[in-house]
């Protein structure tokens, strides 16, 4: 089925400010930051360590509140929502991939991908079918019964990606998803991410130090003086 791009950003950060207390001083990480993520678009977030990449991802993913400003998801302001409402949006609209796969070691690849769907209350038969479909799409159809310890690093990350998109989110947020992988494996994982963006029209924001991979994405942004700036 042909996807139609949304008229509003999937996620929009407007004038976001975030500060932390550091000893007796205040450290300003974001100060008036703006960022729009659109359906079907991949965005690389490249900045030095400590510049605020993880903070930006956490705020965009509703894991952290900004001190000022607003985060819109699908055009809806989130600042006035309850914790339960924010959690519901994270479960349905936002997928996360981390540098460490964070898979549950006692579960198989299939069960790890089924879990987010079961938390939403979907039937086991539905979750099983969708999990198998996603894993097969990512080239893991013959590895679904294996536990994380029985998989390679690249396979573990592809299972983590499958888990992140299990609930068909609007946006995928990834924090250094290839940081622990060798160049060849990192390329395979990156291709899997881009394949999903094209197939599902999910918006994707990846924090990365890998400039070669960043150069293959639709947009590149950085954080400078608390602002999100477009590169190129």
From Swiss-Prot:
UniProt entry keywords in alphabetical sequence: ATP-binding, Cell inner membrane, Cell membrane, Membrane, Nucleotide-binding, Translocase, Transport
Membrane topology: Peripheral membrane protein
ABC transporter domain segment(s): 11-231
Localisation: Cell inner membrane
Keyword Chloroplast: no
GO molecular function, one term: ATP hydrolysis activity
Positions contributing to ATP binding: 47-54
Gene3D superfamilies linked to this entry: P-loop containing nucleotide triphosphate hydrolases
Coarse class of the protein's main subcellular location: membrane
InterPro entries: AAA+_ATPase, ABC_transporter-like_ATP-bd, ABC_transporter-like_CS, ABC_transpr_LolD-like, MacB-like_ATP-bd, P-loop_NTPase
BP GO annotations: lipoprotein localization to outer membrane; protein localization to outer membrane
GO cellular component terms, semicolon-separated: plasma membrane
Family note: Belongs to the ABC transporter superfamily. Lipoprotein translocase (TC 3.A.1.125) family.
Role of this protein: Part of the ABC transporter complex LolCDE involved in the translocation of mature outer membrane-directed lipoproteins, from the inner membrane to the periplasmic chaperone, LolA. Responsible for the formation of the LolA-lipoprotein complex in an ATP-dependent manner.
Subunit structure: The complex is composed of two ATP-binding proteins (LolD) and two transmembrane proteins (LolC and LolE).
Protein name in the entry: Lipoprotein-releasing system ATP-binding protein LolD 1
Organism: Rhodopseudomonas palustris (strain BisB18)
